Amino acid sequence: MSGATSTGDVGYDELAVLKLLALDGAHRGEVKVSCGDLASRLDASSQTASRRLQALDDADHVTRDLVSDGQWITVTDAGRHALKHEYEDYRRIFEDPGELALAGTVTSGMGEGRHYISLPGYNRQFAEKLGYEPYPGTLNVDLPPDGQRARAGIQALDGVDIDAWEDEDRTYGSATCYACTVVGDGTDFDGAHVIIPDRTHHDDDQLEIIAPVKLRERLGLLDDDEVTIRVEA
């Protein structure tokens, strides 16, 4: 695998090869490829082109049928999915985002949100900067794989900084809040915020949302209910 940073199971160098293959039509069906021709288009050696094709094959991004004068290559569903992710990234760069919508399912948290949100150092800032004191607890939303990648786009939007603070016992970390609307089944609540601590044990597969009301009650939500979170740009 090449490239200092990777997307999915392959590096950016392999994604460049995948893009060339798709431009040749390999995402629709088999195309015939020679390593020499591919190397010329990549401005790389034949060995490098062959190595990148092998990496794509190993990651199940392409299927290959080797013949005497080249190889027949098809981009797989996984390969198309990787290219679609790249496309969505570029859309976020060059288009006005308007808002970022993430779909997920309601889940029960571990109760930590209730404790931290009620702490005076945070609560005071919420009132001053968000204009309300949050209900003591967070709405936790699990995100599917596609939503996890889109979640990274939230931090490119304008947010409200919640500063770190300390008391006699410890220091409490900073966070950023992003205005959002929570959409349930036939009803919604405008005036909530996604809260992302700068340091958190949560993975990218979950969102925490605060609001001046108990969102579960306001929207009639239960665990495993589907919701959409519309984060404002």
From Swiss-Prot:
The keyword Flavoprotein applies. InterPro entries: RibK_CTP-dep, Riboflavin_kinase_CTP-dep, Riboflavin_kinase_dom_sf, WH-like_DNA-bd_sf, WH_DNA-bd_sf. Binds 1 Mg(2+) ion per subunit. It is an enzyme of class 2 (transferase). Residues 1-99 are annotated as: Unknown. Pathway: Cofactor biosynthesis; FMN biosynthesis; FMN from riboflavin (CTP route): step 1/1. CDP binds at G109, M110, G111, E112, G113, R114, V213, K214, L215, R216. Mg(2+) binds at T138, N140. Catalyzes the CTP-dependent phosphorylation of riboflavin (vitamin B2) to form flavin mononucleotide (FMN). PANTHER family: RIBOFLAVIN KINASE (PTHR40706:SF1). Belongs to the archaeal riboflavin kinase family. This is Riboflavin kinase. It comes from Halobacterium salinarum (strain ATCC 700922 / JCM 11081 / NRC-1).
